[in-house]
Amino acid sequence: MSSHADSKPWTVPALAQAKRDGRKLVMLTAYDAGFARTFDANGVDLILVGDSLGMVVQGHESTLPVTTADMVYHTAAVARVLERALLVADLSFQADATPERALDAATQLLQAGAEMVKIEGAGHKLDVIRYLVEREIPVCSHLGLTPQSVLRFGGYKVQGRGEAGEQLRRDAQAAVDAGVSLIVLECVPTPIAAQISAELRVPTIGIGAGPGCDGQVLVMHDMLGLDSGHRRPKFVKDFLAEGGSVAGAVQAYAQAVRDGSFPDAEHAYAA
């Protein structure tokens, strides 16, 4: 467990300080009080109530059917039991279609206990980000493979190869300029993710983006080796197999992120 775990709850400013200190951030998804309590007590710094719940909890084929009401329900359940982890919640599909809609959804999530909201994509979403930040709502930007864009991408594929890598760098910097406090990079080649992480003043959290990010996140079902009904991505590792219990798996995952042993080349994408 990190030294921060023994001191005080995580805050948004503490995330930036962790990056300056070179301390890796450990993030996991959670959707209910039971798992959230266990994760919080065993070294997880940030908990994400992700719209991934559409697939791993509700049994859908994608995140698209998830509603703001779904997100609020699960966010509130998780928030009730957290003592130290910072709680991030996703804006669901099209909840961020306009700044006004995003503000309404984000307000509901913060009232339910979230401390930051996550928005997928850049481009026109930058106006949404600025609108929320100007109204004192912390924002995390999700770049690379954005699951809400699965139809446009034609499936779950690595993003940021070749010239697309330069656009990803520009998008990340634009998101920081718009005021985000955190960036998630998903399914991005290791060199590009490392370069982006080195260039930005805010922390990056990788998922299939290599060890050069400032932290890592996994969907809890993947970290525990549970069958989600979908193909296992390359970046997934079953920590329950070596941890022996849920708490042990979380501790093993947290330690591997902090000491840099996860992700290794086997669980990342080359350029």
Curated annotation (Swiss-Prot):
Alphabetical keyword list: Cytoplasm, Magnesium, Metal-binding, Pantothenate biosynthesis, Transferase
Entry's Gene Ontology cellular component terms: cytoplasm
Cofactor(s) needed by this chain: Mg(2+)
Binding annotation for Mg(2+): D51, D90, E120
Protein's pathway: Cofactor biosynthesis; (R)-pantothenate biosynthesis; (R)-pantoate from 3-methyl-2-oxobutanoate: step 1/2
Annotated active site: E186 (proton acceptor)
Molecular function GO labels: 3-methyl-2-oxobutanoate hydroxymethyltransferase activity; magnesium ion binding
Localisation: Cytoplasm
Gene3D superfamilies, per database record: Phosphoenolpyruvate-binding domains
EC number: 2.1.2.11
Record flagged with keyword Magnesium: yes
UniProt: 3-methyl-2-oxobutanoate binding residues: D51, S52, D90, K118
Principal location: cytoplasm
Cofactor binding note of this UniProt entry: Binds 1 Mg(2+) ion per subunit.
Keyword Transmembrane applies: no
Disulfides per UniProt: none
Gene Ontology terms: biological process: pantothenate biosynthetic process
InterPro entries for this protein: Pantoate_hydroxy_MeTrfase, Pyrv/PenolPyrv_kinase-like_dom, Pyrv_kinase-like_dom_sf
Function, in words: Catalyzes the reversible reaction in which hydroxymethyl group from 5,10-methylenetetrahydrofolate is transferred onto alpha-ketoisovalerate to form ketopantoate.
Family in the record: Belongs to the PanB family.
PANTHER family assigned: 3-METHYL-2-OXOBUTANOATE HYDROXYMETHYLTRANSFERASE (PTHR20881:SF0)
Record note on quaternary structure: Homodecamer; pentamer of dimers.
Protein name (database record): 3-methyl-2-oxobutanoate hydroxymethyltransferase
Organism: Xanthomonas campestris pv. campestris (strain B100)
